[in-house]
């Protein structure tokens, strides 16, 4: 039953991709890229749930857990530009807390099977394991599959497997929707030391 529900949710979330030129029509818990976070959360809640993950402060990460309107995910993470007083969302993740890396990767593989036909026609990057740049030890990993839309925006399905000695981060499965600009920041700039 849970698998059927997940398939239906993923189909609903991603059904517009084949018709859309960008990702603003895709939603996670009713929230889209380009929406103001203030339409869903109070300024106080946003500020209270803001974290300081990135060395370069171009974007602000926010992690929202267990809000009443969350039906599918345990948490919703999003980012907005640091100077943006409207809190316009440039990335959004639906997060499921799956602590066991083997179970997480099984779920990831099933989601990949389920959504690949929906994302057909977009550039596909094979599933890979990468080192999480925020962990200086190099022991925290991300297993991921990506699709790149024509304008460079991305859809990713990821398992985050954090080293037990790294912070208090929780292993999780994430379905991520990102603008090209934010993805490039996250992968190339966010965890680098300022020059």
Show which residues each predicted segment covers.
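Sec-dependent N-terminal signal peptides
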Residues: 4-15
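Non-cytosolic coordination micro-motifs
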Residues: 21-61, 91-195
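Secretory pathway targeting signatures of secreted, lumenal, and periplasmic proteins
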Residues: 57-72
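A basic- and aromatic-enriched beta-loop-alpha substructure that forms the phosphate/nucleotide-
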Residues: 81-95
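Broad, structure-driven detector of short, well-ordered beta-strand segments within folded domains
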Residues: 69-83, 153-166
């Amino acid at each position: 039953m849970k698998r059927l529900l997940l398939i239906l949710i993923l189909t609903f979330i991603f059904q517009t991709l084949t018709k859309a030129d960008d990702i603003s029509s895709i939603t996670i818990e009713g929230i889209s890229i380009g929406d103001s976070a203030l339409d869903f959360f109070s300024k106080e809640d946003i500020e209270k749930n803001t974290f300081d993950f990135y060395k370069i402060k171009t974007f602000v990460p926010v992690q929202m857990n267990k809000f009443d309107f969350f039906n599918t995910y345990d948490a919703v993470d999003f980012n907005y530009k640091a100077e943006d007083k409207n809190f316009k969302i440039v990335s959004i993740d639906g997060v499921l807390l799956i602590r066991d890396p083997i179970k997480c990767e099984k779920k990831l593989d099933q989601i990949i099977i389920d959504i690949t036909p929906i994302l057909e026609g977009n550039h596909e990057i094979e599933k890979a394991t990468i080192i999480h740049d925020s962990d200086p030890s190099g022991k925290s990993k991300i297993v991921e599959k990506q699709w790149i839309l024509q304008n460079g925006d991305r859809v990713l399905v990821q398992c985050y497997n954090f080293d037990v000695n790294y912070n208090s981060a929780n292993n999780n499965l994430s379905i991520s929707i990102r603008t090209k600009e934010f993805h490039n920041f996250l992968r190339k700039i966010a965890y680098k030391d300022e020059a």
